[in-house]
């Protein structure tokens, strides 16, 4: 995926504000042996690119001044309540150096699992992405989590899934082995009210109205 940016000569809060007012987004590129470079990008093109899953989990071709470099999206900031990208960070990548990144999870075969079809279980997705390590050439767009054999009362853990070739779990994820999805039977609904009228309450005996005269 190609991203076009331009080198930015002016920095600072005021300069960034003017940049945003002109329809641009400030950013930075860092990493590798080259110095960090401040850049600007067309806001609308960037905003729509950020809506694509592949933009978050792909090696991007960042073109600056006619030269292209391989980068990863590392971070971006959005306005609290406006559809406005305030800032974006890219990291340069080397073809021979592994990178760590969170990759989206795609869950499959939940509807065909025995837990759902035969036992009426509900599948809950506990995680939506997984942090892994890989060389840039092996970057997966997503990682598939097959739920066909999930069992009620049990979960699918990170170490249970088949990772794409060249992709490994980072150390702390492998040690923690988090749950990615689980299956459970829904709680029984409260009993429905019946149409049978309730029996009338017993009536207390009437007090004796006879007065005793002494």
From Swiss-Prot:
- UniProt cross-references to InterPro entries, sorted A to Z: Rbsml_bL25/Gln-tRNA_synth_N (IPR020056), Ribosomal_bL25/Gln-tRNA_synth (IPR011035), Ribosomal_bL25_b-dom (IPR020057), Ribosomal_bL25_C (IPR037121), Ribosomal_bL25_long (IPR001021), Ribosomal_bL25_short (IPR020055), Ribosomal_L25_dom (IPR029751), Ribosomal_uL5_bac-type (IPR020930)
* Cellular compartments per GO CC: cytosolic large ribosomal subunit
Which biological process annotations from GO are given for this protein? Answer: translation
Q: Supply the SUPFAM superfamilies for this chain.
A: Ribosomal protein L25-like
Q: Which Pfam families match?
A: Ribosomal_L25p, Ribosomal_TL5_C
In terms of Gene3D superfamilies, this protein maps to: Ribosomal protein L25, beta domain, Ribosomal Protein L25, Chain P
Assembly and interaction partners: Part of the 50S ribosomal subunit; part of the 5S rRNA/L5/L18/L25 subcomplex. Contacts the 5S rRNA. Binds to the 5S rRNA independently of L5 and L18.
Recorded hits in NCBIfam families, A to Z, give:
bL25_bact_ctc, PRK05618.1-2, PRK05618.1-5, PRK05943.1
HAMAP family, sorted: Ribosomal_bL25 (MF_01336), Ribosomal_bL25_CTC (MF_01334)
Q: Briefly, what is this protein's role?
A: This is one of the proteins that binds to the 5S RNA in the ribosome where it forms part of the central protuberance.
- The name this protein carries in UniProt is Large ribosomal subunit protein bL25
Origin species: Polynucleobacter necessarius subsp. necessarius (strain STIR1)
